């Protein structure tokens, strides 16, 4: 049976939970659309997170890797288009590291595009009634670090495995502590991930629909 690896993060910046892991952990060792899903929780730490990711890829030998992370303030499922080769941490990670203007990979290319059909995934989520959009930036913190490191590793291995990154909003419990911020219930995020997994099984090439932004 084919395997899809989904990663998520531990809590950071004083939060009690990370909604990415709350949504992802329920999929571990489940069958979705005829594939086995395995989940891995990453540390919110520069470099260590990539070590953990690479070990999980080596252990599970997946056909697809979907990394998931929290983006407090976003209102929908954000399917990331691109990762850039820069670490520029506005806050420290969970071990106190705060790199500024350092590369994720020394002498690596400036950026990598997701190898997932990002627009098709967003379209599938819309059909399922789940708010979603294409995002043009994964930030410059550990999420972008993981996305870039993932795509670099997969490229080094011949781009046989597809990979990308998805940002999700706060959970309602978190939003209650951040007045005015949007949220999405954890079961809906889990359902969104299932929709994306099923779409990936039938969609290799992206669809030609707009997913751009004016700013």
Curated annotation (Swiss-Prot):
Gene Ontology molecular function: pyroglutamyl-peptidase activity
EC number: 3.4.19.3
BP-aspect Gene Ontology terms: proteolysis
InterPro entries xrefs: Peptidase_C15, Peptidase_C15-like, Peptidase_C15-like_sf, PGP-I_bact-type, PGPEP1_Cys_AS, PGPEP1_Glu_AS
Compartment(s) where it occurs, according to its Swiss-Prot or TrEMBL record: Cytoplasm
Reaction it catalyzes: Release of an N-terminal pyroglutamyl group from a polypeptide, the second amino acid generally not being Pro
Claim: Transmembrane helix is one of the keywords in the record: no
Active-site residue numbers: 80, 143, 167
Hydrolase recorded as keyword: yes
GO CC list: cytosol
A Pfam cross-reference name: Peptidase_C15
Keywords: Cytoplasm, Hydrolase, Protease, Thiol protease
Function of the molecule: Removes 5-oxoproline from various penultimate amino acid residues except L-proline.
Quaternary structure and interacting proteins, as annotated: Homotetramer.
Family per record: Belongs to the peptidase C15 family.
Annotated HAMAP family: Pyrrolid_peptidase
The name this protein goes by in its record: Pyrrolidone-carboxylate peptidase
Organism for this UniProt entry: Pectobacterium atrosepticum (strain SCRI 1043 / ATCC BAA-672) (Erwinia carotovora subsp. atroseptica)
Organism ancestry: Bacteria, Pseudomonadati, Pseudomonadota, Gammaproteobacteria, Enterobacterales
